[in-house]
Amino acid sequence: MPNIKSAIKRVKTNEKRRAQNAAQKSALRTAVKHFETAAANGDVEKAQAAFVEASKKLDKAATKGLIHKNAASRQKSRLAKKLNGLSA
């Protein structure tokens, strides 16, 4: 355990941020899974709604630095490809 006041604060801050990042990443994964299940069931309307939600979460995660912007873009592209496959 650190003795210096600023180091103690850093430990608290890092723990708080770690928890927030984990929660946001978990929500992101859940949103993507909701899309995947809707797409697997062939439900186009639910898939479209889930795609919008997943896209928002991916963009937000990329903006916050949680995931790389190219990774977010790649995931969105793959999801969009699946969605277009359902519609066609």
Curated annotation (Swiss-Prot):
It comes from the Bacteria. PANTHER family: 30S RIBOSOMAL PROTEIN S20, SMALL RIBOSOMAL SUBUNIT PROTEIN BS20C. It comes from Shouchella clausii (strain KSM-K16). Binds directly to 16S ribosomal RNA. This is Small ribosomal subunit protein bS20. The lineage of its organism: Bacteria, Bacillati, Bacillota, Bacilli, Bacillales. InterPro entries: Ribosomal_bS20, Ribosomal_bS20_sf. One of its GO terms (molecular function) is structural constituent of ribosome. One of its GO terms (biological process) is translation. Residues 1-22, 69-88 are annotated as: Disordered. Keywords: Ribonucleoprotein, Ribosomal protein, RNA-binding, rRNA-binding. Pfam families: Ribosomal_S20p (PF01649). GO terms for cellular component: cytosol; small ribosomal subunit.
